[in-house]
Regions:
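Hydrophobic alpha-helical transmembrane segments of multi-pass membrane transport/permease proteins
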Residues: 2-24, 199-209
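Selective transmembrane-helix segments that form parts of the transport pathway or gating/packing helices
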Residues: 2-6, 50, 54, 63, ...
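Membrane-interfacial helix-loop-helix connectors in multipass membrane proteins
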Residues: 18-47, 112-164, 172-191, 214
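Hydrophobic alpha-helical transmembrane segments of multi-pass membrane transport proteins
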Residues: 38-81
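Selective recognition of hydrophobic, aromatic-rich stretches within alpha-helical transmembrane segments
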Residues: 58, 62, 160-168
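Short cytoplasmic-facing helical segments at TM-TM junctions of multi-pass membrane proteins
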Residues: 71-95, 185-188
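Bilayer-spanning, highly hydrophobic alpha-helical transmembrane segments
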Residues: 103, 107-120, 167-173, 201-209
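Juxtamembrane boundary at the C-terminal end of a transmembrane helix
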Residues: 209-215
């Protein structure tokens, strides 16, 4: 999982920085004028839009499938019914812990991916502008996130809304399709596919809606 998310951070950090500056239109004339604002825009896009979306998509693709598969197997093998017969609170034991774990892991993976993406972006920028000081990168990259007097970076609440909302949507989709009646392995596989499609659709709606409200 860590490698999975780290790769996403590496790709976002490199691609957004390299291709923005490498193929900047009329770079010889505009780069000296727009360099700092462009770097601030890259930091804004990475931290506020791209990384939360990438983390949510990777969570849906991996964890959503795992949840649906695990619960589908339990239902097919009558393990859920056995828990009910034994008086074990399966809603707390399974459903609550799954949702809590998804939200916490989503937040942790977002923070980790943001750090990796920023570091890769810095190294990529340093490769493109070897004669410039890294102080310029730090000042410009985070400038759009540190405006204001708050303790947290600007827009933290919106990022939390996207990540937490997406994690909850992934969890509910996995629980819904995973706990549905399963009579065969085909039903389990169908539940996995339905969980992934539904969770990805929901998180795209959540990110779009929050971004429209935010901006």
């Amino acid at each position: 999982m860590l490698l999975y998310m780290s790769l996403g951070g590496v790709l976002v950090g490199f691609v957004s920085t390299w291709f923005t500056f490498k193929y900047f239109p009329f770079a010889e004339y505009l780069t000296p004028l727009l360099h700092d604002d462009t770097l601030a825009g890259i930091g804004f896009i990475q931290c506020r839009i791209l990384l939360p979306l990438i983390v949510s998509l990777l969570l849906a693709a991996r964890n959503g499938a795992i949840i649906a598969a695990d619960l589908g197997y339990r239902v097919n093998r009558k393990q859920i019914r056995a828990m009910q017969n034994l008086g074990i609170p399966h809603r707390i034991y399974l459903q609550t812990t799954i949702l809590a774990a998804l939200v916490i892991s989503g937040l942790l993976m977002t923070v980790m991916s943001l750090g990796i993406s920023a570091w890769v972006s810095m190294e990529t920028w340093s490769l493109l502008f070897p004669d410039d000081s890294l102080h310029i990168w730090r000042e410009s990259f985070f400038s759009s996130l540190t405006r204001g007097d708050g303790l947290l970076p600007q827009g933290t609440g919106w990022v939390l809304a996207k990540v937490v909302g997406s994690a909850a949507a992934i969890g509910f989709a996995g629980l819904y399709f995973g706990l549905a009646e399963k009579k065969s392995v085909i039903d389990i596989n169908r539940g996995i596919a339905q969980s992934i499609v539904t969770s990805v659709s929901l998180l795209l709606v959540i990110h779009t809606a929050v971004s429209l409200i935010e901006f």
